[in-house]
Amino acid sequence: LPNGDYCYVDNGTGFEKQKELAYPNEFVIYDINDDSIDELLIGIEGTCNSDSAQYIYRFSEKKEEFELLFDYYYGCRFYENGLIYAPASHSGYTYNDDFWPYEVYRYNEMENMYECIASVEELDLNACPEYKDNFPFKDDKDGDKKIYFVRFYEDSLRLDEGEYNDWKEKLFESDLFELNWHTLS
């Protein structure tokens, strides 16, 4: 990686073999956070979950080195309003739909880094009946036995499906960036 870190979990042992086994890695150069400076986005699919990551670097003229602004599991989606949808690498629940837990990041220019502004998890009692004693039935207004736990800044929310869809639609109202990724060899 640009800062000298190794991108696979075995820390450099057998690099050629790891590279041969790995999924295609990719990069794009783009001003992803609208700060008028191009960033280097790198996607490493790797050979296993532990290798899979996406990075955002910016070159610091002052320090004459790359600065890491963001590091997360592979599969992020980048929005024109500056948000990053970042899917979790693992989950503690089972899902009957296409939901997967995720976090949302926004660039903090003062801190020169991306910070997590939201995290979302779904509890579907139909898929996980063992949680019935702890399920917040009073928050399940539509009665479908599905609730979304949302941490948004300092607020902790329990939303039923309609409320969650409204919240998500407002948050991700801007378009996805159409990024022209290139193979990293």
Q: Which role does the model predict for each range below?
A:
Residues 2-3, 10, 50-68, 104-110:
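Beta-propeller blade repeat segments, especially FG-GAP/WD-type strand-to-loop junctions
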Residues 5-26, 72-81, 125-127:
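Repeat-based blade/solenoid architectures
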Residues 16-19, 44-49, 91-98:
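Short consensus segments that form the blades of beta-propeller domains
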Residues 17, 65-69, 86-87, 116:
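Short hydrophobic/aromatic-rich beta-strand segments that constitute the beta-sheet cores
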Residues 31-44, 81-88:
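Acidic/hydrophobic-patterned starts of short beta strands in beta-sheet-rich repeat architectures
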Residues 37, 54, 99-102:
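Extracellular structured ligand-interaction cores
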Residues 59-84:
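Long amphipathic alpha-helical scaffold regions
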Residues 80-185:
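Acidic, small-residue rich beta-repeat scaffolds with periodic aromatic anchors
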